[in-house]
């Protein structure tokens, strides 16, 4: 399983299938509510769009940074929350309403959404088939605004075999799952065409959720796509900083609370939030070190859930003064660095270089996590005693 697919599955469903997808969508609803609460709480700060007091202590600097990211990134945060919530909850609504819309045949709703299956095989061998390069060239001429991304064959050795070209259409927010052209494999005759442009308004809006949520802006053209993907990445990193700074401020405010329930909630927040980062980093490291025959199995999801649960269990069992968050973030940083080294080493031994973007990102994340853990350790260390000079009793 490639690392990108692994992270995508983690983001979509936490490796627990459709229930996990619904759960993740509920976190999208939570993000929308947090945005609303943040706007109400920080409504007086709209006049301080550039204030960041970095010279008056870490807590005040993080407070200002939290407000700045929330204000400047609010449109993207709302986009992340709304599209994330609609993705899973919309699928749940489709599943629940299918028996109402088609009482005799509930599965028909998925045929209406995704299109009919390819023509069935006739059991006769295919004597010759059209050249696929010529078919792609003809499809580009027939549909000039269509950009092919995926090609799949159905019943390739049968006379009824077909080929499907899936892609995107310029100016139409959709994905290759909904923009498809099907041709007969024998002679290249067009058998059918599916597009979100043929759907109603609400269905088109639902289809547009995925490209907007996952920064799939190819439908806008190369220039706009690259710019918006970069902005999307920056806002995603900003959202991570927003969560981290908000959690830190919340924990600091309740650090000295005498209530045992508050201390337990504080401990669980450290375990599950920092544990999520550590489990994801260790999963990436395990992906690099595991044998190839294990990559297609269910172990990545199980490993992630076990590691995350172990972090939550540690929050309950370890002493209250044990630096749990610091330890988990340090482990996550080391795992990110080790994963980058494990990926780069085989390439360097062959005298070649892979695409360095993912590895540089892992190295940067690892360095930042280790630095943060080190700064926490430094802040928690007792001040050094001043050296005694002279006679204080003189």
From Swiss-Prot:
Membrane topology: Multi-pass membrane protein
GO terms under cellular component: plasma membrane
Keywords tagged on the record: Cell membrane, Membrane, Transmembrane, Transmembrane helix
Transmembrane segment boundaries: 22-42, 60-80, 81-101, 231-251, 271-291, 303-323, 328-348, 355-375
Compartment annotation: Cell membrane
The keyword ATP-binding belongs to this UniProt entry's keyword annotation: no
Name this polypeptide is given: Uncharacterized protein PA4219
Organism: Pseudomonas aeruginosa (strain ATCC 15692 / DSM 22644 / CIP 104116 / JCM 14847 / LMG 12228 / 1C / PRS 101 / PAO1)
């Amino acid at each position: 399983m490639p690392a990108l697919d692994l992270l995508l599955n983690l983001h979509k469903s936490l490796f627990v299938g459709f229930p996990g997808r619904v759960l993740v969508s509920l976190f999208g609803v939570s993000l929308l509510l947090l945005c609303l609460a943040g706007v109400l709480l920080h409504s007086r700060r709209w006049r301080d769009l550039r204030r960041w007091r970095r010279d008056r202590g870490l807590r005040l600097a993080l407070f200002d940074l939290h407000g700045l990211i929330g204000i400047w990134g609010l449109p993207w945060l709302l986009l992340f929350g709304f599209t994330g919530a609609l993705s899973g909850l919309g699928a749940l609504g489709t599943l629940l309403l299918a028996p109402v819309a088609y009482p005799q045949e509930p599965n028909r709703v998925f045929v209406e959404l995704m299109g009919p299956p390819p023509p069935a095989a006739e059991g006769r061998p295919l004597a010759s088939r059209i050249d696929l390069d010529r078919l792609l060239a003809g499809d580009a001429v027939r549909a000039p605004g269509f950009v092919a991304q995926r090609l799949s064959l159905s019943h390739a050795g049968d006379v009824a075999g077909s080929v499907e070209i899936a892609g995107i259409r310029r100016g139409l927010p959709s994905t290759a799952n909904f923009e498809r052209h099907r041709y007969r494999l024998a002679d290249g005759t067009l058998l059918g065409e599916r597009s979100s442009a043929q759907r109603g308004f609400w269905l088109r809006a639902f289809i547009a959720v995925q490209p907007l949520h996952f920064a799939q802006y190819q439908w806008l053209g190369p220039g706009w796509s690259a710019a918006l993907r970069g902005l999307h990445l920056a806002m995603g990193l900003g959202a991570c900083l927003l969560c981290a700074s908000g959690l830190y401020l919340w924990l600091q405010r309740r650090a000295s609370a005498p209530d045992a329930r508050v201390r337990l909630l504080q401990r669980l927040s450290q375990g599950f939030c920092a544990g999520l980062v550590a489990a994801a980093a260790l999963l990436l490291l395990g992906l690099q070190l595991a044998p190839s025959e294990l990559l297609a199995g269910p172990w990545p999801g199980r490993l992630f859930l076990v590691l995350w649960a172990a972090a939550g269990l540690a929050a309950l069992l370890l002493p209250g003064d044990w630096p749990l968050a610091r330890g988990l973030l340090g482990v996550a940083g080391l795992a990110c660095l080790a994963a980058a080294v494990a990926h780069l080493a085989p390439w360097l031994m062959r005298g070649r270089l892979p695409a360095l973007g993912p590895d540089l990102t892992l190295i940067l994340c690892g360095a930042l996590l280790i630095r943060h853990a080190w700064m926490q350790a430094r802040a928690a260390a007792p001040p050094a005693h001043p050296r005694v000079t002279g006679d204080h009793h003189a």
